[in-house]
Amino acid sequence: LYVEGENQNGVPFCSYTDEIYHRTGYATEVYTLGNVSCDNYNVGYSDARGNTWYFYYNGIKKTNQLLERIDDVPATSNDDIEKKEQITGQAYFLRAFFYHQLYSLYGRIPLVYHTFDMNAEWTETRADMDEVADSIVADCNRAAQLLPTEYSSNDFGRATKGAALAVKART
């Protein structure tokens, strides 16, 4: 599952981890110091790069599309089944991560678990804080069940069971 390696403002996702070394006075210090809030989140190259809601809900849409269609993909061997499980786990992890980012910034957010028909009316409302947290935890639990604890060096950067449990712990 492909997702951009930076947020909508051009700040790399690695800035959110403890594996980054802060060298400049640029936007990364907001992340490395743990000072991200809805008041200072739009830091980066330019506010014109996009908005937070669009960026994360676009990622949520992609994960929902995958989760709705993954069962249509045939799996005839044990390797195929294992690969499908890993891809499904990655989708649950990414959806949890995207919701966690929105939850951290805005609290009550709409929870969307399906794709929309182009002619459908938008009727989603913001969920309660506990409902959002429970949703993130549920996706993290699903991801942790499906993801491996590590990958080969060729798959560096993919979501692991530990990453899913870390997002769960932060929620």
Name the predicted role of every residue range:
Residues 1-22, 39, 82, 87, ...:
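Acidic, glycine-rich segments characteristic of secretory precursors and extracytoplasmic regions
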Residues 5-9, 120-125:
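An N-terminal domain-start capping segment
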Residues 157-167:
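Amphipathic alpha-helical protein-interaction segments enriched in hydrophobic
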Residues 5-7, 102-111:
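Proline-centered turn/helix-capping motifs that create local helix->coil transitions or kinks
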Residues 26-106, 121-123, 127-132, 140-156:
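Conserved, well-structured interaction surfaces
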Residues 92, 165-171:
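TPR/Sel1-like alpha-solenoid repeat signature
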Residues 115-118:
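Short edge-strand/loop segments of extracellular domains
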